[in-house]
Swiss-Prot record:
Name listed for the protein in its UniProt record: SLIT and NTRK-like protein 2
Gene behind this protein: Slitrk2
BP-aspect Gene Ontology terms: axonogenesis; positive regulation of synapse assembly; regulation of presynapse assembly; synaptic membrane adhesion
Record region (Disordered): 261-322
UniProt repeat feature LRR, residue ranges: 63-84, 87-108, 111-132, 135-156, 159-180, 182-203, 377-398, 401-422, 425-446, 449-470, 473-494, 496-517
Organism ancestry: Eukaryota, Metazoa, Chordata, Craniata, Vertebrata
Span of domain LRRNT: 332-374
Tissues where this protein is expressed: In the adult, significant expression is detected only in the brain. Broadly expressed in embryonic brain with highest expression in ventricular layer, subventricular zone, cortical plate, pyramidal layer of hippocampus, subicular neuroepithelium, thalamus, hypothalamus and spinal cord.
Length: 846
């Protein structure tokens, strides 16, 4: 009996609890939120209710439900915030301004399969952010400010298959971030990824079925080779991977480039230099702007947009009535929308917003209106390679959702006013390879969101003022390979350009004031292949490029005229060489390069838009510098060699026993003279034969001074000679003069050897006499002092001159016989000053 009562009590309590649970759930749906049951799943809609915490809600305990909390004020999620929500399978937390998720906030959500965190303010995904979500399969965190993901953020999400992280601020992905997950769909569009390594990232997503990598600033250099190699080996769907840098590859699809394009130096040194002819042809068509051999007035047929890779499963299901449904229908939160595609075109859809990529290239369309039926919500429209001649005003009225419009390589010569007015969301416009001649302002009305404008390879001759004023977000403008000769004032004043291509036009000079000074400081500009006239008019451009806040010049400005400067780089020319008559001339005052940055404008410039400064020296300049150094080295060596040879020839050969040199080293020559040959100086016994350096007489006045290496003579006082009047009456008398000289070329006639004495003590000896012939001599005493070798060497030239041109002061004439009648008298006379001066002049001329 007692047991029966107990059993009835338990049943009563259970019934009461079940009734209360149903009553509470009913009350939540009636009072606070809107509840709707679909396919046995309860949808609890609590959107825009102003909730600041989920603790105010009492979810049902015995039913599976989807909870929609979008548009509330849940800025922070604290630990155990959802501990009572164990039956939730879907949780929407979008548009809450959510900034922080504390560790353990999702504890208790063991059955949760889908989590939506889109459109919040999250910055970091930590390792403990998703604790408790072991059953999670779908994670959407797009449109946040996520810049950092820790390596173990997804390590506990072993069942995760779809990860949506588009439109965040990711610069890179950490190593092994996907190691413990089996992703099939990955969306990384609209981040700031430049490279993606294979090791640690790509190697862990081998089961991927779809990967979205568009709208990232991919740096197409050697660092991107791992991603390129991985893309070449997979067969899954891959969106467009468009190069942002370097400048030469901007706008090119990575999947259509070769290893040689990405890494020229590395490919040239390895085995990857081999290419298929198909790839070469396709790349050449894809990159018309980089081929200098093309006619600047008309481009070849443009390349096709990159073809999408085939997926293992159909991306778009098209029925007979051409209606299709978007991809990943299993994971969509909204009901699928029927999509239509024009006939003769191929359409693929965008995964995030069901937009279409419409590919209608080379279909022989003559008008855009020929596209029937109209595509539903097109995002990208490719009409390249058709026969379009005019873009009419009403052609694009139903294409307001376009993000990209490609009209390249048609025959477009006319764009009617207002043709693009409805394209308020368009960011990329391709008009390259057409027949446009004039650009005017109304041509681009309505394109306030435009960021990239391609106008290369037209026949543009004129740009009207204010043409680009409405393009306030324009960042890239390609005007290369046209026929432009000038630009109007303030043409770039209303833009936010970071890249400008004016290559291969007809510019001879560009004004700074009103044109170039309107550009921001960090712009990259290409001015090559223009006929620059390097005269005074180009001084403004030179000053602008050399300014402290100067832009990055892609390729140097090369002069074409005048002829003396043809082929020279403007930067290396001096101001005097360019404008010799006025080297200080400049094109107005160089205004601040940050002129446009002061204008209030909400621009988001990625780090890749800032130029990279390269300090590499051009190869031609390096070779020229080395050649100049080599020539200077050869000239210096030759000059040094000649100098050494001259020094060696100029050093005289001095005997080792120079200190013991005696008068015996002098050559004694005999010369006959007639005493009556000169009437003016008959009494002078010298015909001005300069004495040698050595001491010629023992008289103290002829002795050299101590330390003086040059011999000198005292004033002439005594001069001995015969009676002049008696000599005139006598027949010609032969006389011999004994002198020590090294420069007389005429030798005396042979005579019997006479004895000459080197010592005054030997004067007592008699010389042989023959009648009236007598001898005049000077005794040569031995030297009492000989200059050192060093002093003789240092003053050798001066000594030689003294020997040749020294003026004699005094000399003795010895008597031949004391009983000679003509020599008994010893008259003395002073020499004539004019005679001495005349003889000195004559000798100096010799």
């Amino acid at each position: 009996m007692l047991s029966g009562v107990w059993f009835l009590s338990v049943l009563t309590v259970a019934g009461i609890l079940q009734t209360e649970s149903r009553k509470t759930a009913k009350d939540i749906c009636k009072i606070r939120c809107l509840c709707e049951e679909k396919e046995n799943v309860l949808n609890i809609n609590c959107e825009n209710k102003g909730f600041t915490t989920v603790s105010l809600l009492q979810p049902p305990q015995y039913r599976i439900y989807q909870l929609f909390l979008n548009g509330n004020l849940l800025t922070r999620l604290y630990p155990n915030e959802f501990v009572n929500y164990s039956n939730a399978v879907t949780l929407h937390l979008g548009n809450n301004g959510l900034q922080e998720i504390r560790p353990g906030a999702f504890s208790g959500l063991k059955t949760l399969k889908r989590l939506h965190l889109n459109n919040n303010k999250l910055e970091v995904l930590r390792e403990d952010t998703f604790l408790g979500l072991e059953s999670l399969e779908y994670l959407q965190a797009d449109y946040n400010y996520i810049s950092t993901i820790e390596a173990g953020a997804f390590s506990k999400l072993n069942k995760l298959k779809v990860l949506i992280l588009n439109d965040n601020l990711l610069l890179s992905l950490p190593s092994n971030v996907f190691r413990f997950v089996l992703l099939t769909h990955l969306d990384l569009r609209g981040n700031r990824l430049k490279v993606m390594p294979f090791a640690g990232v790509l190697e862990h997503i081998g089961g991927i079925m779809e990967i979205q990598l568009e709208e990232n600033p991919w740096n197409c250099t050697c660092d991107l080779l791992p991603l390129k190699a991985w893309l070449d080996t997979i067969t899954v769907f891959v969106g467009e991977i468009v190069c942002e840098t370097p400048f030469r590859l901007h706008g090119k699809d990575v999947t259509q480039l070769t290893r040689q394009d990405l890494c020229p130096r590395k490919s040239a040194s390895g085995d990857s230099s081999q290419r298929s002819s198909h790839s070469d042809t396709h790349v050449q068509r894809l990159t018309p702007t980089t081929n200098p051999a093309l006619n600047p007035t008309r481009a070849p047929k443009a390349s096709r947009p990159p073809k999408m890779r085939n997926r293992p499963t159909p991306r778009v299901t098209v029925s007979k009535d051409r209606q299709s449904f978007g991809p990943i229908m299993v994971y969509q939160t909204k009901s699928p929308v029927a999509l239509t595609c024009p006939s003769s075109c191929v359409c693929t859809s965008q995964s995030s917003d069901n937009g279409l990529n419409v590919n209608c290239q080379e279909r022989k369309f003559t008008n855009i209106s020929d596209l029937q039926p109209k595509p539903t919500s097109p995002k990208k429209l490719y009409l390249t390679g058709n026969y379009l001649q005019t873009v009419y005003k009403n052609d694009l009225l139903e294409y307001s959702s376009l993000d990209l419009l490609h009209l390249g390589n048609n025959r477009i010569a006319v764009i009617q006013e207002g043709a693009f007015t409805n394209l308020t969301s368009l960011r990329r416009l391709y008009l390259n390879g057409n027949y446009l001649e004039v650009l005017y302002p109304s041509m681009f009305d309505g394109l306030q969101s435009l960021q990239y404008l391609y106008l290369e390879y037209n026949v543009i001759k004129e740009i009207k003022p204010l043409t680009f004023d409405a393009l306030i977000n324009l960042q890239l403008l390609f005007l290369n390979n046209n026929l432009l000769r000038s630009l109007p004032d303030n043409i770039f004043g209303g833009t936010a350009l970071t890249r400008l291509n004016l290559r291969n036009n007809h510019f001879s000079h560009l004004p700074v004031k009103g044109v170039l000074d309107q550009l921001p400081a960090f712009i990259q500009i290409d001015l090559q292949e223009n006929p620059w006239d390097c005269t005074c008019d180009i001084m403004g451009l030179k000053d602008w490029t050399e300014h402290a806040n100067s832009p990055v010049i892609i390729n140097e400005v090369t002069c074409e005229s005048p002829a003396k400067h043809a082929g020279e780089i403007l930067k290396f020319l001096g101001r005097e060489a360019i404008c010799p008559e006025n080297p200080n001339l400049s094109d107005g005052t160089i205004l601040s390069m940050n002129h446009n940055t002061d204008t209030p404008r909400s621009l988001s410039v990625s780090p890749s838009s800032y130029p990279e400064l390269h300090t590499e020296v051009p190869l031609s300049v390096l070779i020229l510098g080395l050649l100049v150094v080599f020539i200077l080295s050869v000239c210096f060596g030759a000059g040094l060699f000649v100098f050494v040879l001259k020094r060696r020839k100029g050093v005289p050969n001095v005997p080792r026993n120079a200190t013991n040199l005696d008068v015996s080293s002098f050559q004694l020559q005999y010369g006959s003279y007639n005493t009556e040959t000169n009437d003016k100086a008959d009494g002078h016994v010298y015909n001005y034969i300069p004495p040698p350096v050595g001491q010629m007489c023992q008289n103290p006045i002829y002795m050299q001074k101590e330390g003086d290496p040059v011999a000198y003579y005292r004033n002439l006082q005594d001069f001995s000679y015969g009676n002049l009047e008696e000599k005139k009456e006598e027949p010609a008398t032969l006389a011999y003069t004994i002198s020590a000289t090294e420069l007389l070329e005429k030798q005396a006639t042979p005579r019997e050897p006479e004895l000459l004495y080197q010592n005054i003590a030997e004067r007592v000896k008699e010389l042989p006499s023959a009648g009236l012939v007598h001898y005049n001599f000077c005794t040569l005493p031995k030297r009492q002092f000989a200059p050192s070798y060093e002093s003789r060497r240092q003053n050798q030239d001066r000594i030689n001159k003294t020997v040749l041109y020294g003026t004699p002061r005094k000399c003795f004439v010895g008597q031949s016989k004391p009983d000679h009648p003509l020599l008994q008298a010893k008259p003395q006379s002073e020499p004539d000053y004019l005679e001495v001066l005349e003889k000195q002049t004559a000798i100096s001329q010799l």
